[in-house]
Amino acid sequence: MCGRCCRDLRVPLGLSEALDWLRDGGEVQLLCEAIPWLVEPAADDLAAAYKFRRSFAALSGTLPLRVVVTVVAAFEGPCPHLQPDLACGIYERRPRVCRIYPAEINPFIELRPAGKACPPDAWSDRHPVLEASNRYMEPSLVAGIDAFRDADVGDVGAKLVLCAVLGVSSTALANEGFVAVLVEREAMMRAIGTAIDRAEAIEGNACAESWTVVSNRRRSREALASVDARAVAPEALPAQQKYLGFHASSDD
């Protein structure tokens, strides 16, 4: 047993997995990031197509965005399901991301052992080959990754509804950070259930309006304002929302 990768995490979940996590007493957060989407990318731009499929359209002022909402199980210290013997207490129904670790969900992120919490022995030659020529070798692993990606895309409409139900309309810029949405457990459970129920009524080209982009960098806010987007500093976020920045605050 190891358990090194089961601590201090935000684990991406599908919406159905999030409901299970909440029913078990865990905490679920939303992480919101946005990509300015001024023009449609070329048909052969596979990275852009991947971002498009897992996001919904929105406007900040007159600036078109694609908003990516990641639903995560959040915990500090050991996972609430990590047992004293380091076994998983929900092993048979653990989230998909736990099942595929240390593989990457994003097809455009390279697997780097140095960036994983696995002990060095996990990468030794005595274990089956995990990856070769940028392809994962184990069929069940590939199936798990595909299942997560399918759920991620399938949940997009419900995530748009979920943000509306929770009154969420703030997002960070992609590559700058996230706006984390921190809602009490029962309220989050009700909101996700409502979002799933209403998702079928959402049209594929639905656009969420009046979003605000949050940045802790003045230059980013000024650049956004110059293209008629609504941009604010993290201090303007409402209660139950928190800015998680990748960079130090900057006023220059």
Show which residues each predicted segment covers.
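Short loop/turn segments that flank or connect secondary-structure elements
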Residues: 1-252
